[in-house]
């Protein structure tokens, strides 16, 4: 029987069993479950009291079933000693022939058996990997339709004399949402995403219909262009005018409405421009004065930590200090509250710890 066993497991009967020679066969590696479940030959002394002692007799926990290691699913790879002991427990003895057959069958199967995946998961993966042919055909048809509409939009816009910016402003007049020139340009060049192209398509379709039917659409577009230009006009003040405003601010930081009108008339500016400039200048003065006062207070107070550093002993425990010095370790900390001179912390006794390798 020994010739049929694998090299990893060579069955050796427990002490007290029979053998061919005086010393019996050479000892080899034995599965512990086979050793515990072995009863011994008839008439010979067993390895424990009773018939077929199990793991409970030797004080060892019972081995869990193989499927407990896999979360309730059967393990597909070959397991060592599965055929040696029954799954129900380790107390039932097993004949020597059956144990050897179990070892032989498991040792010969070198490659693990593949686990069978659940049918539902395999079906879902297959549906994800294989696209629906009907959906792909619909997407291709929509893409072709968008390409044709983009060409039609560009031709209609150029024929009627609209720019891309005019189209965006007209959409704002018709639907309440203004689109930029870049968006219209990217739509005509098919550079937008498929999702954004589909969202913008119905709005542009309505614009084409309005451009064909409404003759006043271009006049509305021009009026909207003027309104957009008036909304935001950046004010630029010359250096000479800014210097005059600065000198007037030093004389009167908060002028009245009559004074603002007089200043605007002298400098040739609008009243709103002068009023906003004085308001911004006052805010700037408040920020600069507050920063200056905080800096003066900080310099007058001096160092926030008088009295120098204060040393606090660390909590007892292993610390990495200089080797060879067994004194207590201290760390230098700074307290936000100044301590009067003469006061000191009560002495704290810290027992130096020895090396953990040589401790008793």
Curated annotation (Swiss-Prot):
Q: Which domain of life is it from?
A: Eukaryota
Q: Which InterPro entries match?
A: HD (IPR001356), Homeobox_CS (IPR017970), Homeodomain-like_sf (IPR009057), Lambda_DNA-bd_dom_sf (IPR010982), POU (IPR013847), POU_dom (IPR000327), POU_domain_TF (IPR050255)
**A single cellular component GO annotation:** cytoplasm
Where is this chain's protein located in or outside the cell? Cytoplasm; Nucleus
Where in the sequence is Phosphoserine found?
111, 236, 289-290, 355
UniProt domain comment = The POU-specific domain mediates interaction with PKM. The 9aaTAD motif is a transactivation domain present in a large number of yeast and animal transcription factors.
Give the family, as the similarity comment puts it.
Answer: Belongs to the POU transcription factor family. Class-5 subfamily.
Can you state the subunit structure given in the record? Interacts with PKM. Interacts with WWP2. Interacts with UBE2I and ZSCAN10. Interacts with PCGF1. Interacts with ESRRB; recruits ESRRB near the POU5F1-SOX2 element in the NANOG proximal promoter; the interaction is DNA independent. Interacts with ZNF322. Interacts with MAPK8 and MAPK9; the interaction allows MAPK8 and MAPK9 to phosphorylate POU5F1 on Ser-355. Interacts (when phosphorylated on Ser-355) with FBXW8. Interacts with FBXW4. Interacts with SOX2 and SOX15; binds synergistically with either SOX2 or SOX15 to DNA. Interacts with DDX56.
Q: What is this protein called?
A: POU domain, class 5, transcription factor 1
Instruction: Name the gene that codes for it.
Output: POU5F1
């Amino acid at each position: 029987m020994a010739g049929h066993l694998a090299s990893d497991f060579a069955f050796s009967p427990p002490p007290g069993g029979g053998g061919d020679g005086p010393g019996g066969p050479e000892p080899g590696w034995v599965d512990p479950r086979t050793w515990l479940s072995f009863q011994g030959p008839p008439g010979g002394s067993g390895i424990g009291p009773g018939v077929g002692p199990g793991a409970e007799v030797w004080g060892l926990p019972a081995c869990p079933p193989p499927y407990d290691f896999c979360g309730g699913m059967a393990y597909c790879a070959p397991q060592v000693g599965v055929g040696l002991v029954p799954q129900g427990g380790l107390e039932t003895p097993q004949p020597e022939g059956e144990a050897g057959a179990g070892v032989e069958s498991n040792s010969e199967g070198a490659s693990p058996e593949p686990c069978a995946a659940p049918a539902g998961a395999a079906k879902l993966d297959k549906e994800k990997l294989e696209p629906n042919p009907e959906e792909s055909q619909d997407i291709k048809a929509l893409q072709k339709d968008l390409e044709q509409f983009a060409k039609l939009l560009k031709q209609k816009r150029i024929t009627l004399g609209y720019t891309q910016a005019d189209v965006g402003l007209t959409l704002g007049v018709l639907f309440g949402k203004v689109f930029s020139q870049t968006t219209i340009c990217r739509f005509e060049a098919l550079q937008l995403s498929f999702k954004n192209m589909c969202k913008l398509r119905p709005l542009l379709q309505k614009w084409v219909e309005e451009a064909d039917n409404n003759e006043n659409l271009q006049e509305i577009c021009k009026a909207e262009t003027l309104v957009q230009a008036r909304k935001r006009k950046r004010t630029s003040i010359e250096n000479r005018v800014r210097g005059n405003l600065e000198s007037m601010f030093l004389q009167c930081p908060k002028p009245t409405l009559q004074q603002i009108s007089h200043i605007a008339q002298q400098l040739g500016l609008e009243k709103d421009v002068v009023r906003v400039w004085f308001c911004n200048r006052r805010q700037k003065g408040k920020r600069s004065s507050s920063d200056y006062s905080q800096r003066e207070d900080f310099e007058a107070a001096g160092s926030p930590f008088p009295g120098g550093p204060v040393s606090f002993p660390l909590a007892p425990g292993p610390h990495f200090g200089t080797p060879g010095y067994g004194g207590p370790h201290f760390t230098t900390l700074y307290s936000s509250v100044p301590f009067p001179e003469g006061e000191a912390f009560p002495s704290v006794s810290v027992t130096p710890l020895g090396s953990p390798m040589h401790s008793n």
